[in-house]
Amino acid sequence: MQAFFIGTNSKYIHTALGVRYVTEYCRAYGIFAHMLEATVNEPVLSVLTRITEQIDACDGGDNETILIGLEVHIWNRQFVFELGELLRKVLPDCFLMLGGPEVMFHPVKIFDEARFADFIVCGEGEEAVAELLLRLTGYE
């Protein structure tokens, strides 16, 4: 299993702390976790290309399970939803997960709006995401 956590910031001077925490927490459990940061000012197709290139560079084989986590904030929601739709088309077999403050208050509504998503993580994600990944790989 490979996990890729994507943080989409409003500017280059911002950093996605949640993505960093989740990535490092998963690595502590032996999960192959990677992160990528982008901004809402980048073309969504450029970010999509960067994600797919990073996945290709870390390729563990045709049968490897891939999870992509997208962090959703009020300032990047539209961008992330567009990116999620494109990821679903380009990588139909991967798991797509949403997390962050914008999804935790109305997860059912978010699932209705973001039909591309397989999972939504509410609240602090470090433990929940690591547990999800371990269960997906069969290491409960």
Would you name each region that the model predicts?
Residues 18-27:
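Short catalytic helix/loop segments, enriched in acidic residues and glycine
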Residues 12-18:
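Short N-terminal binding/cap micro-motifs at the start of the first secondary-structure element
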Residues 2-11:
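Nucleotide-activated donor-dependent transferases that construct or modify glycoconjugates
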Residues 25, 32-140:
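Glycine-rich beta-alpha loop elements in corrinoid/cobalamin-binding modules
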Residues 11-12, 73:
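A generic secondary-structure micro-motif detector
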Residues 1-2, 64:
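A generic secondary-structure signal marking the coil-to-beta-strand transition
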